Amino acid sequence: MESVVLLLAFISLVCGYVIDPCTPQERSTWHVSIKLCIRVQEYKISSRGCRLTQGPGGLIATGNGFKIFAYDECGHDEHSFLLTNIRESVYASGHGMYAEISNNVTYLDLVSPCARNITIIVSCDDITINAYGKNIDELHPDVTITTLIDTSCVRGHSFAYSINTLCTERLSGESCEQLACQAIKGSQHENYLKACELNAPEQYMFKEYKPHQRPHVAKVLRDEL
């Protein structure tokens, strides 16, 4: 995709003048997007909507049959979590759930390495067995995304990542790698996705989670409660 930018710059130099196709802000701002498709068989997901709890170290999305934990590897007050937005939708009469976690991050290539080391965990609401399938991806610029999927109830999953500058996305005409989920493809997801309702962290919230989930809550909140 960056080759498009280089080609335009080369053509402009040959013609005797320089045209910068992007603004400085577009060059320095990165759009980070993580897309997940989760499929179940034994039970149906109730489309109750989702709730979002944000902490300094990450975020928690609850509802729609799953808990999603996302956090980095930074310590107390070291760096705020980079991703702030999550939207979800339920498909296939309750047998599938689609989620997008994203944000625009300025100077992503310069932030602390700990903030670029991100873990995404999908944990089922009604199952207490701690059994996760693990996947690790190394992405540019030095971003590591680890996904842990609760295999005790999830029967299939797929995911896609996109980390590009706004300049690259505008010139290429692509905002993110597309991910089909339960026969819904590409931009069609926009017709169904709903943003999670924001909740403030509370002292009692640890009691809402299973014992094996509480370490993830602590990583999100960085033990502030």
From Swiss-Prot:
Protein family membership: Belongs to the poxviruses B9 family.
Stretches assigned to coiled coil: none
Top-level division of the source organism's lineage: Viruses
Name the record gives this protein: T4 protein
Pfam short name (any one): Pox_T4_C
